[in-house]
Structures are given as C-alpha cells and as structure tokens.
C-alpha cells in the first residue's frame, strides 16, 4: 500500500479511535499519520483528527482518523463523534487489565451510535512492555472472535503492527464498499449503512481475524 497526497483520492473513510484514557490512542494516530511518537503523556482535551491517503489496489483512499483526545475521561463523547464512521479501533493497554475490562462497554456505545456494518478492530497496545503484560493474547483474541472483531497487538512506541492495524481495517472497509457498490446501481453515494443498517449480517459478514506476528 503506497502513499498519495491528501488532495488526490477516490474515497474518504472515517475511522474512530475509542477506549480508555492513557491506552495510547493519540500515539497510534500520530504514528500512522505522521510516523511520530510523543513521550509526553499530557492529555489534550477535545476532538481531533489527522488524515493519510493510501492506495488500496488502484483506488486512493483518504483515511480520516478521529481521536477522542481525552474526552473519554469525562464521558463526554457524543453521537457526532461516531456519525459517519465506517471503521473503529477499540484500544486497550495490555499492561492494564482495567482498560481491557471495559472494552465491552465501549463496544456497546459504539454500536449504539454507529452503523451496524462498521468495521471494528480490537487493539491491544503497548506490546513493547511484554514483561508488564496483564492481558493474555489468547483472552483478547477469544473476545474478538466471540464478537466478530478483528484483533491485533501493537506498539505505538516501536511501531509494531501499527501500519498493519490501520491497513487491515481500511482494507476491510474497502471490501465492503466495493461489494456494496457492485450490488447497487441506484446511487453513487458510498456508505456502509443505509439499507444494511439494522439487518443481521449475512454469512461471512462478521469474521474475526486474530493476527499474531
């Protein structure tokens, strides 16, 4: 998957980062979009997003990655944050089990506000701190499988699997968009919701993908 300028693209995919404060969402965002990492743990209050345009086959896709930037501390995330999102990374800190214990609540909130067809990846961040691990890979992988989520462990610090996590989500979104585009001749608008929202997914629509590298 190559890079393109942000001015030249065929699709825009909104992807949201959710999870408890301090799990590394902002650094995952900056690592993917700017290849940067900040050791400063101060929390920025507000909603922010960054973009990066990538190639999926012959299509240029502008990934618009949204970060809660601390609002999760105050339960202040609104439905507007989720509106229009076609992908989500649900992030927990694999060295703090309490951040994993609440992923089910985050998942419920996501599904309460987003389209039913949204692509979701569970992300166990801070894999570089393996000796401090509190969440076994197998446990998180099983949760992902049981809930039809993708799953990866990442390290925003040393870049492990960060690129793969975002690429995998974007490819899953693109596959759904392409399928919907082929099945629809009535409109040129591309979303993952509309007629599909609220319906039970068909065979193969929700599939888990536990990736261990």
UniProtKB/Swiss-Prot annotation:
A motif (Switch 2) lies at residues 67-84. A lipid is attached at residues 209-210 (S-geranylgeranyl cysteine). The keyword NAD does not apply. It is an enzyme of class 3 (hydrolase). Its EC number is 3.6.5.2. Keywords: Cell membrane, Cell projection, Cytoplasmic vesicle, GTP-binding, Hydrolase, Lipoprotein, Magnesium, Membrane, Metal-binding, Methylation, Nucleotide-binding, Prenylation, Protein transport, Transport. Regulated by guanine nucleotide exchange factors (GEFs) which promote the exchange of bound GDP for free GTP. Regulated by GTPase activating proteins (GAPs) which increase the GTP hydrolysis activity. Inhibited by GDP dissociation inhibitors (GDIs) which prevent Rab-GDP dissociation. One of its GO terms (cellular component) is cytoplasmic vesicle. The keyword Transport applies. The modification Cysteine methyl ester is found at residue 210. This is Ras-related protein Rab-25. Pfam families: Ras. Mg(2+) binds at residues 26, 44, 67. It is a lipid-anchor.
């Amino acid at each position: 998957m190559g890079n393109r300028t942000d001015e030249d693209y065929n699709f825009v995919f909104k992807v949201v980062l959710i999870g408890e404060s301090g799990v590394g969402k902002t650094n995952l965002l900056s690592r993917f979009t700017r290849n940067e990492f900040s050791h400063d743990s101060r929390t920025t209050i507000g909603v922010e997003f960054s973009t990066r345009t990538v190639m999926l086959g012959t299509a240029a896709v502008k990934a618009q990655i949204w970060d809660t930037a601390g609002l999760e501390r105050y339960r202040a995330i609104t439905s507007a944050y989720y509106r229009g999102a076609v992908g989500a990374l649900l992030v927990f800190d694999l060295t703090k089990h309490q951040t994993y214990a609440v992923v089910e609540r985050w998942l419920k909130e996501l599904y309460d506000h987003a389209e039913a067809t949204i692509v979701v990846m569970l992300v166990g961040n801070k894999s570089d701190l393996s000796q401090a691990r509190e969440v076994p890979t197998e446990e998180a992988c099983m949760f992902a499988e049981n809930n039809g989520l993708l799953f990866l462990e990442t390290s925003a610090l040393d870049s492990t699997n960060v690129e793969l996590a975002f690429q995998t989500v974007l490819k899953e979104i693109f596959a759904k968009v392409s399928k919907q585009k082929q099945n629809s001749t009535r409109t040129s608008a591309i979303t993952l919701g509309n007629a599909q929202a609220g319906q039970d997914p068909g065979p193969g629509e929700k599939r888990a993908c536990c990736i261990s590298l």
